[in-house]
Curated annotation (Swiss-Prot):
Signal peptide: none annotated. GO terms for cellular component: cytosolic large ribosomal subunit. Belongs to the universal ribosomal protein uL16 family. This is Large ribosomal subunit protein uL16. GO terms for biological process: translation. One of its GO terms (molecular function) is structural constituent of ribosome. The keyword Ribosomal protein applies. The lineage of its organism: Bacteria, Bacillati, Bacillota, Bacilli, Lactobacillales. PANTHER family: 50S/60S RIBOSOMAL PROTEIN L16, LARGE RIBOSOMAL SUBUNIT PROTEIN UL16M.
Amino acid sequence: MLVPKRVKHRREFRGKMRGEAKGGKEVSFGEYGLQATTSHWITNRQIEAARIAMTRYMKRGGKVWIKIFPHKSYTAKAIGVRMGSGKGAPEGWVAPVKRGKVMFEIAGVSEEVAREALRLASHKLPVKCKFVKREAE
């Protein structure tokens, strides 16, 4: 699972996700990609589930690039704990994904296989996605 090796601060502010992604909006490594059309936090477990769904469908053929990394921690308090008395303990890691960001890329397989693999991966994610191709240069 994807987690940072070390971080400067264990607990972070939630922050806001306004607007579109600034970078990473085009397919750069592979031939096909999965682009987010809405903004959301994506956990390291969701990223791993999407990766497994893609690689199993492709039967270990082709190459997959994961272009997002869960660098932001999120906290949670235990169930039944009253309000106050500090911020909760770190619960997991998330990648804040804005709309327009290409999250996964695939190369080395046909378009039909890539389209289906990315469709299966999109069902594991909390964002609406669309299939994109590399722009002809």
